[in-house]
Regions:
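N-terminal targeting signals for export/organelle localization
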Residues: 1-49
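Generic structural signal for well-ordered beta-strand positions
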Residues: 56-57, 154
């Protein structure tokens, strides 16, 4: 192999390592204030109103299957892109996973309805409160938590997540 070709390969490899290092650092920084998932911490309870004014209760100690709680803001452009990934996963999960989408940082119910009008969603859409935001330590949008069947926080993330990345976190795809 020519010396010049080796240099290009090493340079490309170094650039990939730098990119991965930056990506990992940013991901860690985004998640640092979220609830920990490396312990046996139970997810917080909540009772929130849905879009038809029914109260939905979530009690992690009563869970019998995995749950994804997705937090979004109606003004968030990344949320507009990623919520369709969540819906696609819900459609293909055959009811084996509970899904909740929780609107936060909204000014009016109409603002949330306008957001929802752009998406064909079948999961429950709940109107979150500042208490919900604080209980789940949401610092940006979109954010989500995967909660196992025992109510324990299993995974978390903030920002855009690909459909395949979410499927891996939910245990629907094995690597």
């Amino acid at each position: 192999m020519k010396k010049e070709t080796k240099k290009k390969i090493v340079s490309g490899f170094n650039q990939i390592l730098i990119f991965l290092g930056i990506f990992i650092a940013i991901t860690w920084w985004q998640q640092k204030d979220m609830l920990p998932t490396s312990s046996s911490l139970r997810a917080p309870n909540f009772s929130l109103v849905d879009m038809t004014d029914n109260v939905v209760h979530f009690n992690p100690s009563e869970q019998t299957q995995k749950t994804l709680v997705y937090f979004f803001a109606p003004w968030c452009s990344v949320c507009h892109i990623s919520i369709d990934n969540i819906e696609s996963i819900k459609q293909s999960s055959d009811g084996k996973i509970n899904f909740y989408a929780v609107a936060l940082d909204w000014k009016s119910k109409q603002e949330v309805e306008t957001f929802l009008a752009e998406h064909d969603l079948t999961m429950p859409i709940l109107l979150g409160t500042n208490e919900t935001l604080n209980d789940f330590k949401i610092g940006g949008f979109p954010s989500y938590y995967v909660i196992d069947s025992n109510g324990i926080l299993q995974s978390k993330d903030m920002g855009y997540t690909t459909e395949i990345g979410m499927r891996v976190r939910l245990g629907l795809v094995e690597l």
